[in-house]
């Protein structure tokens, strides 16, 4: 819409009104399933309703979840698994069969509105799949047409790292390795089919990676008088999310597609994390989600500085804290509910509750400043014994005398316990390999502690922050 600067104000307003008329500003929830202790699909749908969420995105086409969503007014996004993209891109019959199996039995009783082909494919280092993505999207769209299904938009969610440059927003540029061969034909497809550019956008990570230059309140929509003016566009920003979204908008404009609409496929703020993950707490999580929902559901739509008045369909991440998600602790702590169905904090997806209307006070944040000191990596509570044994073997197989101290007769052999030995191995591995990318995760089996577990002559290696 930036190219319409010469259009009279009333005409611009009319164009925005027409382009947004059929797009709902209702906010949804991402329903991930990477947990071994999550409620049933039917219970989960009731929790989604309790949030007043009007959209839900799942990361597959789980039949039990889809059946539980039958006859609700919740708009549903389903997903083609990453591993099927290559085959679907080369076979219309396989695409037709996927739609026949995963869409036709449920539509229209389930309000499937978006069919997403893969998840963050362009972040995957396997670049071979990149070039199959748009062909697979075209085939899925053709399959929907074959089955006379017209109301489902086809797209694919991308991470913000599809951008090579994002600051200032007016300098937004797609990565050179994907811009021409993948993004441009994708935008052509999205423009032609009136679909969306789906983007996963997390101000938390942008802030956490650059705390020295980004004010926390600016990331949480609490900036007050804190603003940023883009020298290239002269647009003024009051929050970090708008900056990130406009970087995408400018990148699309740079490729000749200024009017492809943006859909926030994921955004959110972690309610907890590892000791070294600053700002991941309930207070910040609730503040961000409440504020972003209020912004996105405001009528008339606020949009962004580069796209004022544009509706931005959005889905918050995520429904649950998922205990089997790999990676650092924040990955397992984006939920609005604990796995037992208890709310972590109150949030109203309708946007009707004023920010002062949430009665239960939030716990004061204690980690908005980086932790300074030593940290050890230990086996987490209530984890699978077999999995711990496998992780111990992995840590010890990396060399560098990682596990010498827990060999028979050595200073850390006693007590002769799997969990003791694994905790030593985890700490030793992390201390040695953190600088080269090693983490204290071990597929969710490990946790960080500031308490020194050393005992007697056994000294556990530590990481110093």
What are these regions (language model features)?
Residues 32-48, 92-105, 180-184, 387-391:
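Short, acidic/polar
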């Amino acid at each position: 819409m930036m190219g319409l600067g010469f259009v009279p104000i009333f005409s611009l307003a009319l164009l925005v009104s027409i382009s947004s008329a059929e797009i709902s500003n209702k906010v949804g929830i991402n329903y991930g399933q990477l947990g071994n202790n999550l409620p049933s699909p039917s219970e989960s749908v009731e929790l989604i309703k309790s949030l007043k969420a009007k959209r839900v995105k799942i990361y597959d086409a789980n039949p039990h979840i889809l059946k539980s969503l039958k006859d609700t007014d919740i708009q549903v996004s389903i997903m083609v698994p990453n591993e099927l993209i290559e085959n679907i891109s080369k076979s219309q019959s396989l695409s037709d069969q996927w739609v026949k199996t995963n869409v036709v039995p449920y539509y229209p009783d389930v309000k499937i509105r978006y069919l997403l082909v893969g998840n963050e494919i362009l972040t995957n280092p396997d670049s071979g799949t990149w070039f199959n993505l748009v062909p697979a999207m075209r085939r899925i769209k053709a399959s929907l047409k074959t089955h006379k299904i017209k109301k489902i938009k086809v797209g694919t969610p991308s991470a913000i790292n599809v951008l090579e440059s994002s600051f200032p927003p007016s300098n937004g540029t797609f990565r050179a390795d994907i811009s021409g061969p993948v993004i441009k034909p994708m935008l052509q497809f999205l423009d032609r089919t009136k679909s969306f550019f789906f983007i996963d956008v997390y101000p938390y990570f942008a802030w956490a990676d650059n705390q020295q230059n980004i004010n926390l309140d600016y990331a949480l929509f609490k900036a007050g008088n804190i603003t940023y003016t883009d020298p290239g566009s002269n647009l003024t920003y009051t929050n970090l999310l708008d900056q990130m979204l406009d970087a995408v908008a400018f990148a699309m404009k740079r490729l000749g597609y200024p009017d492809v609409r943006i859909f926030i496929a994921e955004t959110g703020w972690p309610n907890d994390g590892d000791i070294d993950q600053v700002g991941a707490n309930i207070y910040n999580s609730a503040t961000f989600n409440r504020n972003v929902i209020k912004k996105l559901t405001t009528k008339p739509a606020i949009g962004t500085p580069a796209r004022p008045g544009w509706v931005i369909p959005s889905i918050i991440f995520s429904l649950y804290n998922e205990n089997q998600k790999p990676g650092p602790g924040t990955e397992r702590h984006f939920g609005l509910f604990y796995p037992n169905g208890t709310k972590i904090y109150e949030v109203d997806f309708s946007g009707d509750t004023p920010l002062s209307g949430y009665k239960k006070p939030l716990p004061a944040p204690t980690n908005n400043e980086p932790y300074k000191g030593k940290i050890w990596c230990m086996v987490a509570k209530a984890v699978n014994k077999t999995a711990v044994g496998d992780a111990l073997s992995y840590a010890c197989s990396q060399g560098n005398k990682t596990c010498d101290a827990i060999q028979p007769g050595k200073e850390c052999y006693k007590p002769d316990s799997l969990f003791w030995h694994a905790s030593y191995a985890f700490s030793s591995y992390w201390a040695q390999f953190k600088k080269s990318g090693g983490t204290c995760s071990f597929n969710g089996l490990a946790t960080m502690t500031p308490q020194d577990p050393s005992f007697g002559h056994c000294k556990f290696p530590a990481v110093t922050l």
